Amino acid sequence: LPLGPQWGTIGLVKFELVGDIEQVETIASGRGVKIRTHLQKAYGKDRWRKLKGVATVRLPNRKLRKVELHWYEAHGIGRRDFKIKTYLV
């Protein structure tokens, strides 16, 4: 998926997505998204999905790492709340 400059967090530490997110899979959608109420209040009502994929990120120490990311997405709202779940080799 093509991306502009996008940022996420590891706790309170920011990271930058570098390049595209690959191997995108839907984990949950609609009522299956546990924090749906929070997402609707914070970003707007729409059909929210939780997704995961593999991407390269730039960490605050400027190192590039390949990681598994999780995030939420809704049509017309976009991607929100990126989280690094696993560092890959």
For each predicted feature, which ranges?
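Cysteine-centric segments in proteins
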Residues: 7-89
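Ser/Thr/Pro/Gly-rich low-complexity, intrinsically disordered segments
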Residues: 1-5
